[in-house]
Amino acid sequence: MPEPTWIGAEIATKKAVPDGLWTQCPECAETVFRKSLEANLMVCPKCDHHMRISARRRIDQLLDPGTFEALDADMAPMDPLGFVDQKPYIERIRDTQRKTKEQDGVQTGTGFIKGRKVVVGVMDFTFMAGSMGSVVGEKLTRAIEHATDHNLPLVIVCCSGGARMQESGFSLMQMAKTSAALARFDSAGGLYIAVLADPTTGGVTASYAMLGDVIFAEPKALIGFAGPRVIQQTIRQELPEGFQTAEFLEKAGFVDRIVHRSALRTEISRIIDYSGK
C-alpha cells in the first residue's frame, strides 16, 4: 500500500526545522522559543529562572551598545605545573578555547552603563566553570588597578565554581592578589559594585565576590563556599533549607539587594549617581 503523501511532507517539514530554535528551562522544563528567551535576557518567561549566560552576552546586556573596550584581551593561561588529571591541563585549556572562542574565564574592559563610564570584569561560566586561575586573577587585578588609576567605578559580575584546581597554589594566590588590589582601590576612594550570579562559589566567594561596597545578586543564585554536602559532613548538623541562595543571604545581610536581570543596568547606574562617581 503506498504511503500517504502527508506523512512524507510532515517528515520533510520536521527535517527542515533547524536546531537551536527552542530551549528548555532547566528549572520548570518549559520549552521556550530561543529568540523570545534572548529578548527576555535569557530569563524564563514562565518561572523567571535566570539562566547562565556567557560573559559576552552579559556585557551586551549590561553596557551601552558599542562602548565596550577590552583590557588584556590576548592574555591566555599556561601550564607551569604540567598538571594532568583525566587529560593534560594544557589540552583541556585548548579544547575549551576552541569550544568557547575565548582565551580564559573572564572578560575585562571599560564601557558605559547608561552614560556612566565604568571598568567591568565579567566571569564566564562556560569556560571551565568560570574557575579562577592565574589569568583570571591577573586580568581582574589589572582591571581593578585601571579603575584605581583612572578613578572609575568598578563592576565585577561573579559566576564561578571557585579556584581552578589544575593550577594549585597559583590559583589560590589570586584570592590574596585580587583582595589586595581591592583594598588599594578602596583606600583611593573607589566604588566597587559586585554582582553575584548563579553560581558564585569557592575561592571567588572567599575573595572579591564579597568585598563590594554594594553587593547585588540575581534571584535564586547559588552563593557559597563549599557545597552543602561537604559542610554537612564536616559539622554534622542539619543545614537550613536554601541557606546558599541569594534570598537567604539577603535576609542574613550578606547581600544588599536581589536585582532582576532586567533592572541591573538601572540599579547600577543609580548607585554610581548616588556615590557621586
Region roles according to the model:
Residues M1-T13:
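N-terminal alpha-helical interaction blocks
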Residues K15-P18:
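N-terminal targeting/trafficking signals and adjacent low-complexity tails
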Residues W22, L41:
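Residues immediately within or flanking Cys/His clusters that coordinate Zn2+
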Residues C25-C28, C44-C47:
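Short cysteine-rich clusters marking metal-coordination/redox-active sites
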Residues T31-V32, H50-M51:
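Cys/His-rich microdomains that often coordinate metals
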Residues R52-M128:
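Long, charge-rich boundary regions
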Residues D104-D186, I193:
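Cleft-lining beta-strand/loop regions that shape enzyme active-site pockets
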Residues C158-G276:
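Conserved catalytic cores of soluble enzyme domains
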